[in-house]
From Swiss-Prot:
This protein's name: DNA repair protein RecO
Classification via InterPro entries: ARFGAP/RecO, DNA_rep/recomb_RecO_N, NA-bd_OB-fold, RecO, RecO_C
Entry keywords, A to Z: DNA damage, DNA recombination, DNA repair
GO cellular component terms given for this protein: bacterial nucleoid
GO BP terms in the entry: DNA recombination; double-strand break repair
Function: Involved in DNA repair and RecF pathway recombination.
Pfam family, one: RecO_N
Origin organism lineage: Bacteria, Pseudomonadati, Pseudomonadota, Gammaproteobacteria, Enterobacterales
Self-association state and partner proteins as the record states: Monomer.
Family: Belongs to the RecO family.
Length: 242
């Protein structure tokens, strides 16, 4: 793949005294691992561009699992993330690194990612709605199809006044039992619309996406959450990550 592709760096680390190993998300090739030779040298013009949240054009090639970066250009300055929006951006980057296979095309997800970080950059309040929409979009692209509009047991449309319990691989079934797997019909309608008008629907969306993403993430904790807990005020941590 030698043509130019739109891309974002998800993560980078030193590979040698002068090179970087990059985990990138591209429009056409999906997630790709690249070696950026010479990117750490003092004379390199790439070092400043190969950063998370900077829209890039990349050209790369090679036959193995690890490709070689041929050229890179920053399309614009990095999207301005700071504080809680920066940690939110690091979270979605880590999420993609954990759940996406290498070199599997996700062109629509690429634009969902772009829209998410643009929303984070422009956020004046909580970043949670943008995060929940992205998580739901990611689950959809991974093939995790869930029907939020109809009861999996009866086939009847979801009633906003009723309670439904989530069952993996089946969907939501009307239930009188209330536990961490139950959702109100109103909450399910909010999930389906990807609109979260209040704290109740946001909490429900977080609860569902945590539950649905767990099989993809396994038991290994996300480093971005740990960083968030270390460096952000406790009240903010509880509000956004608990």
């Amino acid at each position: 793949m030698e043509g130019w592709q739109r891309a974002f760096v998800l993560h980078s680390r030193p590979w040698s005294e002068t090179s970087l190993m990059l985990d990138v998300f591209t429009e056409e090739s999906g997630r790709v691992r690249l070696v950026a030779k010479g990117a750490r040298s003092k004379r390199s013009t790439l070092k400043g561009a190969l950063q998370p949240f900077t829209p890039l054009l990349l050209r790369f090639g090679g036959r193995g699992e690890v490709k070689t970066l041929r050229s890179a250009e920053a399309v614009s300055l990095a999207l301005p993330l700071s504080g809680i929006t920066l940690y939110s951006g690091l979270y979605i980057n880590e999420l993609l690194s954990r759940v996406l296979e290498y070199e599997t095309r996700f062109s629509e997800l690429f634009f969902d990612y772009l829209h998410c970080i643009q929303s984070l950059a422009g956020a004046t309040g909580t970043p949670e709605p943008a995060l929940r929409r992205f998580e739901l979009a990611l689950l959809g692209h991974l093939g995790y199809g869930v029907n939020f509009t109809h009861c999996a047991g009866s086939g009847e449309p979801v009633d906003g006044t009723m309670t439904y319990r989530y069952r993996e691989e089946k969907g939501f079934i009307a239930s009188v039992v209330i536990d961490n797997k139950t959702f109100t019909g109103r909450q399910l309608k909010a999930l389906n619309a990807r609109e979260f008008p209040d704290a109740d629907t946001l909490r429900a969306a977080k609860r569902f996406t945590r539950m649905a993403l767990k099989p993809y993430l396994g038991g290994k904790p996300l480093k971005s959450r740990e960083l968030f807990r270390q460096f952000m005020p406790k009240r903010t941590v509880k509000t956004h990550y608990e």
